Amino acid sequence: MKLPALAAALLAAPLLTGPAAAQTVSIVTTPAGSYTNSAGAAMAKVISEKSKVRAILQAQAQQGMIPVEAGTAEFGMSNSFDLTFYVTGTGEYEGQGVKKKTRLVASLIPYRVAFHVRADSDIKTIADIKGKRIAGGFNAQKTIARITETLLASAGLSYKDMVEVLAPNVSRAAEDFTAGKTDVLFFALGSAAVKQAAATVGGVRVLPITDSPEALKRMEAVLPGSYVVEVRPSPQIDGVSAPIKTLAFDMVLCTNIDVPEHVVYEATKALHQNKAALAATFGAFNLLVPDRMAKPVKDVEFHPGALKYYQEAGIAPKS
């Protein structure tokens, strides 16, 4: 005996609601142990718990915008200057053409990056690393080479002044530093990989950056939009025992224009309204200023779903 159509629909209804019905999306990050990967894990957790969307991590070596533009991932994490270069086909992406599908979701927390040395090293300043061994190449993460060049430029140095040890990405660079193959480690402050390196080599020390007008001009020429911030000692940051200045630029979340508006809206809302939950998983999110999430990135359009939420929240950028 067949059930009436209405009864069948009522029985099926529970199967179409709740967590099981949530749309699953992926967030592309850099490899496990990196600052971006840790931030992405916190974001995926909050989006999954605080919205109608289920988010999972997709850690890989390539830049997060690439699978987003290709449509193989819904969200990707990057930084402000690299996203601009990618979308406009400039910088490391010269000759690759304009990307027409990548859109901005949010400007998040600052990447605070620095050179690290072993705690017992006689290296005290960035100028002191001239002639030392440092990771380079970064074929899988070309933007890392540019950031490294920016830090070197702050002291009037370049890769030509260094002994370059080739590494495909920052994770390999951290392994080489721990193994004693390099003298200097570039990484974001507070990253899991830095903590692991510190535990292995007996501690690390962060090299301060100078913010003289000349240094700022040299850095801006290499890394547009970068800035200098003061970092104070914190249990979450290895290698900082007194207030110092470091290089910074913004972490951003991007998506594809074809990702449904409601999905991006839900993700944006969850991130904006749950700073405490984000910080509970990854302490760097204590630096998040939710109402600055709508900060524009040069030459990159907002996704309509993100813009809709920002308009409702009263923080949309002025056109």
List the model feature ranges, each with a label.
Residues 1-8:
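Bacterial N-terminal signal peptides that target proteins for export
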Residues 9-10, 20:
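Cleavable N-terminal signal peptides
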Residues 16-22:
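Sec/Tat signal peptide C-region and signal peptidase I cleavage site
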Residues 23-49, 53-55, 111-175, 179, ...:
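Bilobed "Venus flytrap"/periplasmic-binding protein-like clamshell domains
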Residues 75-109, 192:
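Acidic, polar ligand-binding/catalytic clefts
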Residues 80-82, 89-93, 121, 158-165, ...:
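Pocket-lining segment of extracytoplasmic ligand-binding domains
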Residues 131-150, 225-287, 294-295:
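Ligand-binding clefts/hinges and TM-proximal coupling segments of bilobed small-molecule sensing domains
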Residues 179-180, 189-206, 211, 218-220, ...:
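An extracytoplasmic/periplasmic, membrane-proximal ligand-sensing/linker region
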